[in-house]
């Protein structure tokens, strides 16, 4: 009897897991020379009965560009968006843990944006309502997506035909890595992105990948989240980005909290119970026409 109950419990857990994730999309399937690349994104469709926003968001977990917090920052975020009528795609992008550095990560997020837009009709998505949200190093990645969609078109460099824009419609960097400058850079993320050593980390490259130095005039609307007590990424990263966005008159918002630390994502925790930062994001996205 105990064995039957255990098997039933496992079946329920497995079924719930399947229900939460609707499809696995391989980014580089059938792309010559890229077929063996492991990058995938996990699709979470809007929950039945939720608003028909036709908005999509690509979720980029953090992990210092070395590994990925798929569960803590990826799945919890995708669940919240899907409950609010947004199709979410958790991006498992390549990282230094598997010996990948730039441009692998940027290739992956640009390819993800391309695939979402190219399949928008099939997936009930408005191609003009495709945003990105990222945490920590993932915050740097989504900011790159917002800044580099023209200057660093990795899809074109690979010779892949693309008839859609690679510009996200909104960008949400959460406790993000922003700068590569020596004074406040998150060194692990910098090493993972650029590679170690002076040859890989020239001042020119540090400037190129410092997001606060490269905000374009057509940067997407950006919502930045930061906590003063962040023990991992120095909060000044977010403040520099926000100042740069304001200087360029970009539509932006700074969700600035006294405490909360780092790595909370959208999972249940004391910080979320106290501040509900995702509800502040909800209001902002609603005002822009991306949520209801």
Kindly label every feature range from the protein language model.
Residues 224-226, 230:
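Short beta-strand/loop motif that positions the catalytic acidic residue
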